[in-house]
A protein has these predicted regions:
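Catalytic cores of carbohydrate-active enzymes across secretory and cytosolic contexts
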Residues: 1-502
Length: 502
């Protein structure tokens, strides 16, 4: 039977920009979630009927969305075998929903980022922002309901049974309310579709989650419990979610083998863990391309046979770049034997520059990098190379040449870099990994786990990684790569679809 899949996410698989002549140019959307979902959908094969609904994020996206409305299939455009529908949400609504609620409140709660003596402060302005978040989610629910009804009516017209109805995959904290809204819009037809929600972030424990206003916290949980299946990257995040459901909503929670069954408002939601790894063959093939190999040559020349500590992150508060740099400074201060023998490549992608906290954080990263270079650098040795720009080939090259990979988030839903590094490593890399990354659940056996807040422990782990015998480093790296390749995007997404079919 032909698979019908609807995907909904804030960011889509394609984004647009204006060329010099004013024409639209499309490019693949960025981010680990986009890559994972896209690769999983491609693995379904050409017979799958896939529509991806996303928000128009830029002026160019909004023009593209308007042009799509004139297409034969209103609002739908083909992109690499996936039909994409961009929703033109009013900019003020989008800004308040995305920046003020999703990124400034929900992201901070789930990553435990608030400076609690002064933050958060939920007042009348936040209530206005919350109304925008409601509107934003309603827009997605309306679009999904329309597409689901079209799919169901097509099946009835062609004599197909309703069990072949669409499976709907709703992504992340931007769209927590959509599952319940969609179920209410579909009414009785909801039994003929499968509604799934996946959280790519951690989930806050109940005591911290209660920081949100009561009606907001309850609405988010109730929204996700409108789904038939709710997925998380790691067991600890799924456990925190069901604990919140029990403590805050009074929902009935029961373990069911490797999953949980949460009963609320007469509906049962299955909560399960789906770790996301990497497509190792595709990743290695991409790394063999000329643009990546050119960066490999440049990085090796810059290192001049010195050992390389590599990090690849967004300039995101939770990625903990500042403490990572401080740990590197402590390594050089307390282990002088590494001076002149190691280079730290810190490659970062600009992130959320619309938020003042992120601009200040990026400035602090740049300032700290300068201080380390001024303190330890010599005429023939730059201890640190920091680049803050979007350069995917450079990032792949850095992973390929790394002797040590530093991944030290204060909290992370999964973290793909920790898995991509060992897969791409040419000589074997030692992984220094935060115990607070979701990936630690699968990679702990062969990584050097650290408390991301402990600078001294991180510096010592960097020393151990640098001093690790080649044979041990290569053995660990191979084991890490095997684990990372065991849960490729096709398996990750296929597991969710299978759960919805059951």
């Amino acid at each position: 039977m032909k698979q019908r899949v609807l995907v909904a996410s804030n960011r889509g698989p394609v984004s647009y920009q204006f060329d010099a002549d004013g024409s639209l140019a499309g490019q693949r959307g960025g981010g680990g979630m986009i890559a994972g979902v896209t690769e999983g959908l491609v693995a379904l094969g050409p017979e799958a009927d896939v529509t991806w609904i996303c928000a128009a994020l830029s002026d160019a996206d909004r023009v593209a969305a308007a042009l799509q409305l004139a297409a034969a299939r209103a609002g739908v455009r083909e992109e690499g075998g996936i039909r994409v529908r961009m929703l033109d949400i009013p900019p003020d609504i989008f800004d308040r929903a995305y920046n003020n609620v999703a990124n400034s409140a929900l992201w901070f709660v789930h990553h435990l980022l608030f400076d609690t003596p002064t933050q958060p402060q939920f007042g009348h302005e936040f209530q206005r922002d919350w109304e925008s978040y409601l509107t934003y989610n309603e827009t997605f629910a309306d679009a999904l309901a329309q597409r689901a009804r079209e799919a169901l009516s097509g099946e009835v017209g062609q004599g197909r049974p309703p069990s072949g109805g669409p499976r709907i995959l709703i992504q992340d904290y931007h769209l927590c309310l959509v599952p319940r809204m969609l179920r209410e819009r579909l009414g009785g037809a909801a039994r003929d579709v499968g509604i799934g929600h996946f959280s790519h972030t951690p989930w806050a424990p109940p005591d911290y989650y209660r920081m949100l206003p009561e009606q907001v916290g309850r609405a988010l949980l109730d929204g996700i419990l409108g789904a038939d299946h709710a997925g998380f990257h790691a067991e600890r995040w799924a456990t925190a979610f069901v604990q919140c459901c029990a403590a805050i909503l009074g929902a009935e929670v029961a373990p069911a083998g490797a999953t949980w069954r949460v009963t609320y408002r007469g509906h049962v939601t299955e909560v399960a863990v789906h770790p996301l790894g990497v497509d190792a063959p595709a990743l290695r093939e991409r790394a063999r391309a000329g643009d990546v190999q050119a960066h490999v040559s440049m990085l090796r020349a810059a290192a001049a046979d010195r050992k390389l500590i590599v990090r690849v992150d967004r300039t995101e508060l939770s990625k903990n770049i500042v403490r990572g740099l401080v740990a590197y400074r402590e390594l050089l201060a307390t282990r002088p034997q590494w001076r002149g023998r190691v280079v730290h490549l810190a490659f970062a992608y600009p992130s959320r520059s619309a938020l003042a906290e992120y601009r200040a954080y990026t400035d602090r990263v740049r300032r700290l990098a300068r201080e380390i270079t001024e303190e330890f650098g010599t005429p023939d040795w730059d201890p640190l190379i920091l680049e803050v720009k979007d350069d995917y080939p450079r990032s792949l090259a850095a992973c390929a040449v790394a002797d040590v990979l530093l991944v030290n988030p204060v909290r992370d839903g999964m973290n793909l870099v920790a898995q991509e590094g060992p897969v791409l490593s040419e000589r074997g890399c030692a992984l220094v990994l935060s115990r607070e990354a979701g990936a630690a659940a699968t990679l702990a056996a062969d990584a050097l786990l650290v408390n991301p807040y402990d600078i001294t422990e991180t510096a010592e782990a960097l020393h151990q990684a640098l001093a690790m015998p080649d044979a041990e480093r290569q053995r660990r790296s191979a084991a890490l790569a095997a684990v990372a390749a065991a849960d490729p995007p096709a398996r990750w997404l296929g597991g969710q679809l299978a759960a919805l079919r059951s």
